[in-house]
């Protein structure tokens, strides 16, 4: 038996591989020349045996008896026959070659452009057979969530730029359909202007979808009930802090580079109206102070004090006196003590650079810091940023739906949102690289509605170019393309260039209309000109010609039907389609749009989560002190201890 197996292996090793398509194409192209050689070769052989007084007579005999030349299938090997056959084949090849090289290139019907609308056949290779595993773009077009399709030429990144004026349905026709899909291994981060999306879709996400095993079979418990896989819902509410979970940026600092990133985000998103590039000295000085103080808090303060409240206390305690350069405040003394223990400490090195400023200059820097961090004077903001419940670093490890609620009229607290997004991108990329070998187990979809209102995310143009490989994608939702240029300036082109998909829902902003019209291209149309000349003898004329026309001009885009949209996918013809109708989705009945009973109540959910965290069976140590005992705490060893059950 072992001998038979070895023979089979050897036979497999000698299997002939199928020829390459390019090789087959070249062979087929040369077959006509082989036929010419063969026919001329055989006729030349027969011509030598034809009798006649002239060449014409011999050719006539050849034509009358040409079947005799092919009685033997093999070509003649006589030198004369081989030479004439070769010359004939080469001559035909030369004629074809030079005719093709010098010939005119006609593209009938495409003289002025070949633009056209895409159809079902064009989008078919990009659609996943499992409906839930698609990004819903229009009523008829979808894009698979699979980042590695069988044919690499159909691979597209999942970054989408959605453009639509006010009232065009960006939330209804794009954001909600994505949430209704609820794919198995996808988490969502949603910017929610006014906080309506979480109310309308939260209950559906909290319920989740049926849990499946590795074979795709729905799991059931011992009672036969379907086991559900709900989304873990997180909420940051910058409109009503009472309805927000806690977010502490200090919780996600892992190293000195994270301190620098956090400081940079604060500086970029809290610029005053009068802050200009000419005042660069002051911003750099502020940056040094922030790095020093945050570095001290991160490395030296207990975990419960690592927050913005402590940072404000440091700044408030940083008193300076113009008339007394030798004066040392409480913060100076803390850093001097730290320097004695660790002279090369990151915070110490930053603080020493800051202290190079004279008393008057330092006072101006502190005033700038106080003005920049003025929003933290609000007790509610300090409270929600006192500790962390967001688990930003775990969004790519578990089914999560993070809602970031922002005001569409007031940007006072948008710097907090920009801070969160900046940390989120960095945390997810680092976790993908360090823990999951480059790819997160859960694809993180960021649905950034009203993207222009969340502030500036540092180096976003570089992030969007690299997040694809880590299973992260961003949907940038704008009212016009000019909004992106206003915030990101020259980097706006890079950002749009890294979005393989563009969805236009309607609008009237001229720059946007112009760019979309140019991108759609031109088609070739037929043009008829008629003339009617009246005089002594009346004459009519009809002139036919071709001309070019935009597939959709700016004025046509401006008056586009409200139910229509335009989809552009890289490498595919554009689509003019109906917007997605959420009422036809199988999960529409789980939204509050269908039934008000489906409204999601954030406070109740947060209360329930708190009750889950506080297990009633868990025991805690309770220490009780009298005032006299507090005074003698260092010497008193008799502490009262109780148990809470």
Regions found by a protein language model. Name each.
Residues 1-168, 172-178, 214-222, 522, ...:
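Basic- and hydrophobic-enriched, low-structure N-terminal and domain-boundary segments
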Residues 2-7, 26, 30, 38-42, ...:
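P-loop NTPase motor domains
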Residues 121-125, 415, 451, 507:
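A short glycine-/small-residue-rich loop at the edge of a beta-strand within enzyme catalytic domains
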Residues 464-566:
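Conserved ATP-driven motor cores of ASCE-family P-loop NTPases powering translocation/secretion/packaging/pilus
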Residues 131-137, 415-422, 516:
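Conserved long hydrophobic alpha-helices within structured protein cores
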